[in-house]
Amino acid sequence: MTGTGKTVTRVDLCEAVYKKVGLSRTESSAFVELVLKEITDCLEKGETVKLSSFGSFMVRKKGQRIGRNPKTGTEVPISPRRVMVFKPSAILKQRINSNGAGGKTD
């Protein structure tokens, strides 16, 4: 995976695990799906997922507020909801910024 600005998909992650770890394609796919499911399950429960040297995923509550319809200018109530937030680690920020917009090409 290189810093070409492309979007990395599940298939790309599975292929990277297959090539770098040595698992079969089926095992690599199952591994990636298991990790993503575990992260999803934790976030659904409102838990923070902290991955060292990468960052943290967390769920935050947003209260009800008044918004505006941009076309009409009419006030519209926005319901309370939960949003997922990602906060990159200092190490990840440094790697991204020290290698330009393209990132590291390992």
Curated annotation (Swiss-Prot):
SMART domains xrefs: BHL
Pfam families from the UniProt entry: Bac_DNA_binding (PF00216)
Cellular compartments per GO CC: cytosol
One Gene Ontology term from the biological process aspect of the record: regulation of translation
Stored Gene3D superfamilies: IHF-like DNA-binding proteins (4.10.520.10)
UniProt xrefs under CDD domains: IHF_A
Keywords carried by this UniProt record: DNA recombination, DNA-binding, Transcription, Transcription regulation, Translation regulation
Signal peptide span: none
One MF annotation (Gene Ontology) recorded for this entry: DNA binding
InterPro entries with a match to the protein in the record: Hist_DNA-bd, Histone-like_DNA-bd_CS, IHF-like_DNA-bd_dom_sf, IHF_alpha
Function: This protein is one of the two subunits of integration host factor, a specific DNA-binding protein that functions in genetic recombination as well as in transcriptional and translational control.
Record-stated family: Belongs to the bacterial histone-like protein family.
Subunit and partners: Heterodimer of an alpha and a beta chain.
Protein name per UniProt: Integration host factor subunit alpha
Record organism: Nitrobacter winogradskyi (strain ATCC 25391 / DSM 10237 / CIP 104748 / NCIMB 11846 / Nb-255)
Gene field: ihfA
